[in-house]
């Protein structure tokens, strides 16, 4: 019998949630996703030193201003890592906009344009890129405009139905609902443990998936942020699942037989009127878990972005 990972691949597109080239070679995913935390981790891998050196040298040619050099080196490094990953995956790479721009639509759009340009200068067509944005109202509005330009987006840090609905209504290419972080919040809040079937993160993604399919939305649902393979198995059939190397290894070493759990609706019905900004903010605010986890996620990505910039600043000074 095929291992659990190979079985899963027959129902769901598997995406590697890592910047580690060796892990991607090992598990042969369709796509890969990165974020500031993963870029920071990847930047400490010795094999990547040439990519960092290239980003530093390039940034020095763009500007004499150190703050601009740091910004440029950070963007160039993310793209350099993405370009390497794209040599190994047949599909797409997700590269994230600076989390500190999560509440600034115009600057998010400008950063997305810059990342796309850097990829194109490296010979990568925009059809192989997903621009990652936090699922704030401003991020969703930025994505709507980018999608209209033909730049596909991955809306991340998604914890609530309101965020998912707004993304679909904006015509976003893909969303990344965070399964494990939802579970973390509920375990801490209630003091209870949950099995995979009743896992609040699994329940959330299932609800979003069913809503999208019932209403004929084309937005791809990509479950993310897993804590155990039980969550992953319960979401077999989801459009895509992005999984870190340790859980990919566990799935590859497992012989558990799986069946699709998420099955698209056979008929669709028209959706209602799109959410207004006021409705979105109210609905989102009614979910304390989502409010907490979105804010925390943005803060933590910003912290790791800052750590990366400290490292780059030291290298730029040499």
From Swiss-Prot:
Record EC number: 2.2.1.2
CDD domains, per database record: Transaldolase_TalAB
Primary location group: cytoplasm
Active-site positions on this chain: 132
Localization in the cell: Cytoplasm
Domain of life: Bacteria
Pfam families (alphabetical): TAL_FSA (PF00923)
Catalytic activity: D-sedoheptulose 7-phosphate + D-glyceraldehyde 3-phosphate = D-erythrose 4-phosphate + beta-D-fructose 6-phosphate
GO terms classed as biological process: carbohydrate metabolic process; pentose-phosphate shunt
Pathway where this protein functions: Carbohydrate degradation; pentose phosphate pathway; D-glyceraldehyde 3-phosphate and beta-D-fructose 6-phosphate from D-ribose 5-phosphate and D-xylulose 5-phosphate (non-oxidative stage): step 2/3
Keywords, sorted A to Z: Cytoplasm, Pentose shunt, Schiff base, Transferase
GO CC terms of this entry: cytosol
Uppermost EC category: transferase
GO molecular function: transaldolase activity
SUPFAM superfamilies for the chain: Aldolase
PANTHER family in UniProt: TRANSALDOLASE
Function, as annotated: Transaldolase is important for the balance of metabolites in the pentose-phosphate pathway.
Stated family: Belongs to the transaldolase family. Type 1 subfamily.
Subunit structure: Homodimer.
The protein's name: Transaldolase
Encoding gene, per UniProt annotation: tal
